[in-house]
Amino acid sequence: HQLRNTEPLNLYLMLLDIDRFKLVNDTYGHLIGDVLLRTLATYLASWTRDYETVYRYGGEEFIIIVKAANDEEACRAGVRICQLVDNHAITHSEGHINITVTAGVSRAFPEEPLDVVIGRADRAMYEGKQTGRNRCMFIDEQNVINRV
């Protein structure tokens, strides 16, 4: 599979992972964990803009494909999503759960295999997890990772 860009904007892949999701499952149970995942998916779908598309990737991970003019614009989208998640509690039958996500953003270059783009975004996201969570990280074409 490859990501194809047919417009003048660049394509970016944002990989989101719910921080400490295992703790949610261990504390509240898998049913509440499932409610959290479904609710977050609904939130993400409502928060994405016309040039962004959200997908459930698996487990507690989501992918957002972002069309942006440049790296900075794509990074702003990542920060916006992380802040929205941080500012909206998930309501369930027993109350509310405050969650955060860590995001990794990578540009998808023309004809580049999807797994390569996901791998780069995953490395950026992992770096964000290792350096504190609840943040957005960008990985550039030289594989340099920076917090945004």
Description of each model-found segment:
Residues 1-12, 19-46, 55-59, 63-64, ...:
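Conserved long alpha-helical elements within nucleotide-processing catalytic cores of c-di-GMP signaling
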Residues 53-56, 97:
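A short pre-motif secondary-structure segment
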